[in-house]
Amino acid sequence: KVARESRAKARVAANHLLSLINDILEMGKIEDRKITLEHVAFNLKELCDDALVLCKLRASDRGITLLNTSEPYAVDQSMIGSPTHIRRIIINLLDNSIKYNKHGGTVTFSSTVKPLNDAHALFCFTIEDTGIGMAPEFLKHIYEPFAQEGDDARSKFQGTGMGMPIVKSLIDMMGGTIEISSELGVGSTFTVQIPLDIDKN
């Protein structure tokens, strides 16, 4: 039993180290401007559905309910942008809300599209969780690499401290915005807006 537990701990530590290395490499590419945004057509609803499917298993394993309250007709349309990076942003934020949540908690994803004119629109999505929340002081530094909150319940979770800096950098590259509201012991809400071109074809 002791040997089995030791192997399990070693596997968790190895996975954490691999995640950290991958995040550091990706952040380095962003800072060196070696990441190229796509400009391709994609279906927004399919992208959101794909991201949610990838995260549902992890949520289920942790006893957390992942809900999608998006407006299906609003997001079921073809847009032009960088789907690979938008998907990464959604998955990172969903993973965050799942990781720092409590057994029996919920994570709710909601999205819509707000037309700006005939050619451009805003993809707007919100991720709301019933997790452990964040202190106001930590929120001031959340986009700094390796930012960790070590004096409360978050310290027992193994985060790399790179997820939010990557998310913020990718959103900035696309000319979007992210806002976070959080309350300790209650949960957090992430609101993102990303400008996209409307696919006319």
Please provide the spans of the model-predicted regions.
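Short conserved segment of the HATPase_c
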Residues: 134-148
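Short conserved segments within the C-terminal catalytic ATPase subdomain
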Residues: 58-70
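Helix-loop junction within the histidine kinase core
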Residues: 28-39
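Short alpha-helical segment of the dimerization/phosphotransfer core of two-component systems
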Residues: 12-17
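Short helix-loop "hinge" at the ATP-lid/N-box region of the Bergerat-fold HATPase_c
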Residues: 97-98
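A conserved beta-strand-to-alpha-helix junction within the catalytic ATP-binding
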Residues: 38-53, 87
